């Protein structure tokens, strides 16, 4: 196929050029009915192609014309049998993969550091999780990936598992031995589902880790908006092989798409594919070179450590995406949260995420030399500062953790109910500090990085209470709970009842 083509973007442009008078949605009528402040900011061109799925513009839920051709071009570019454009991000992609691969009540093996959208998939699908423990680097305070050995041991212990789901790469860029995992999974004729949200660029440069489809995944999800040139919310789902029924997959995809999709988002996927298929290698060569040079410069700053190839080969780090730069600041006496805040407030540099010890900087095809220089300057100035540990955090309780240089992550709690059962059960609010021993009925996710610490159906342990209390004191935002301050938590109601109402 001709990868220089952008069939869907082209039909939108043709519609605009035709001068059609619209009497259809959206109501702003190509910007004419929009408030001028927003119209002037967005520009007429964007608003002109914010159209609806009328005749000639195809239908994302039932593509037969330009969208179908655009998806076929994407499948060829990614080495897949089928590719699907998504406008609800990899969140919907993760949930689609589970519902397409399994039936309610069946079991799926997945790592504990799966994104919270995977928990949403478990709740919606009625699938039961068998948790796998990823490899952990306690010194860096981060989870990596699961190994083929862990997958094999899990399947040996749970022979009734019907699919395996893995995360590769992680937020920090560590990738799994996907070929090894695929061999383990496929020898039992099970499907392998891969959350490759952070790896949409892997396919297009030999210096990057192998992509999931090439490694043997049956389904994989890519957040093209995270690392490539498409707009926010956009992602692609890729399918290869015969273990997943294509008719069922297409039916599930439709459940997660709007009947009024933003066609600007769809067009951005079409154009981003063309850009990577035709220019990706050159663009990524520059990005990788810039990232590696910046990593080297950062490592020359006293008290700063940015891991790279030195981590490859360690447990859970089969390979590494060089475009992710993890800036470890614990030797400076700062938390990652504080460092992120200082970089933003004082040096106008915004990192992707922070955790207890680290800040993460993403380098993409849009990162410039000037931007990299600003990052290096900000971190260099940060290293010269002499500030107390609680300069931006509400409490200095983290000082001992920083001095020891380690941080123990909580163990996976016992599962007492299936996630769907607990989520839909009769519930009550109880004081969080006194909730140990109760069955959780909601997802508690420190964000970023968006990995649930406890999920519906799991027993709240004292260790988890302590962990989340410390995260709260460090200023971490909690996503998922009814009480966003986590003074209370929703649990499955017990026969004796009783609702705790937090004081205002």
Where are the regions that the model predicts?
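Conserved N-terminal alpha-helix of the aminotransferase class I/II PLP-enzyme fold
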Residues: 46-92
């Amino acid at each position: 196929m001709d990868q220089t083509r952008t069939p869907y973007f082209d039909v939108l442009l043709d519609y605009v050029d035709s001068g059609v008078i619209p009497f259809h949605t959206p109501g702003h009528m190509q910007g004419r009915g929009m408030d001028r402040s927003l119209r002037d900011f967005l520009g007429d061109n964007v608003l002109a192609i914010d159209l609806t799925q009328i005749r000639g513009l195809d239908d994302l839920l039932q593509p037969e014309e330009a969208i179908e051709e655009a998806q076929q071009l994407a499948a060829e570019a990614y080495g897949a049998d089928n590719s699907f454009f998504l406008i609800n991000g990899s969140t919907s992609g993760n949930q689609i993969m589970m519902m397409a691969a399994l039936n309610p009540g069946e079991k799926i093996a997945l790592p504990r550091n799966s994104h919270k959208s995977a928990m949403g998939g478990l709740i919606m699908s009625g699938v039961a999780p068998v948790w796998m423990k990823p490899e952990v680097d306690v010194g860096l305070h981060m989870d990596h990936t699961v190994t083929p050995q862990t997958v094999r041991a899990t399947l040996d212990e749970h022979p009734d598992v019907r699919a395996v789901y893995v995360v590769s790469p992680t937020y920090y860029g560590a990738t799994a031995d996907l070929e090894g995992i695929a061999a383990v999974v496929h020898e039992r004729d099970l499907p392998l589902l891969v959350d490759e949200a952070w790896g949409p660029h892997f396919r297009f440069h030999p210096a990057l880790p192998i992509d999931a489809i090439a490694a043997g995944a049956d389904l994989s999800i890519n957040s093209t908006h995270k690392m490539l040139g498409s707009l926010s919310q956009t992602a692609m789902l890729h399918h290869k092989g015969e273990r997943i029924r294509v008719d069922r997959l297409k039916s599930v995809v439709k459940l997660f798409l709007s009947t009024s999709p933003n066609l600007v988002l769809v067009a951005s996927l079409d154009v981003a594919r063309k850009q990577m298929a035709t220019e990706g290698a050159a663009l990524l060569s520059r990005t990788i070179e810039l990232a590696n040079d910046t990593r080297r410069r950062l490592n020359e700053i006293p008290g700063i450590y940015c891991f790279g190839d030195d981590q490859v080969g360690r447990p859970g780090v089969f390979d590494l995406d060089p475009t992710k730069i993890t800036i470890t600041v614990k030797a400076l006496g700062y938390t990652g949260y504080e460092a992120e805040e200082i970089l933003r407030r004082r040096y106008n540099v915004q990192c992707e995420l922070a955790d207890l010890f680290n800040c993460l900087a993403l380098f993409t095809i849009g990162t410039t030399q000037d931007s990299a220089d600003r990052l290096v300057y900000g971190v260099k100035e940060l290293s010269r500062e002499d500030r107390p540990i609680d300069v931006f955090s509400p409490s200095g309780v983290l000082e001992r953790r920083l001095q020891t240089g380690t941080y123990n992550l909580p163990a996976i709690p016992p599962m007492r109910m299936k996630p769907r059962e607990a989520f839909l059960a009769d519930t009550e609010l109880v004081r969080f500090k006194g909730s140990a021993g109760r069955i959780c009925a909601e997802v508690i996710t420190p964000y970023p990085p968006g990995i649930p610490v406890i999920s519906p159906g799991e027993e709240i342990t004292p260790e988890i209470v302590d962990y989340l209390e410390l995260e709260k004191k460090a200023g971490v935002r909690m996503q998922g709970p009814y009480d966003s301050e986590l003074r209370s938590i929703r649990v499955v109601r017990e026969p004796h009842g009783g609702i705790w109402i937090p004081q205002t």
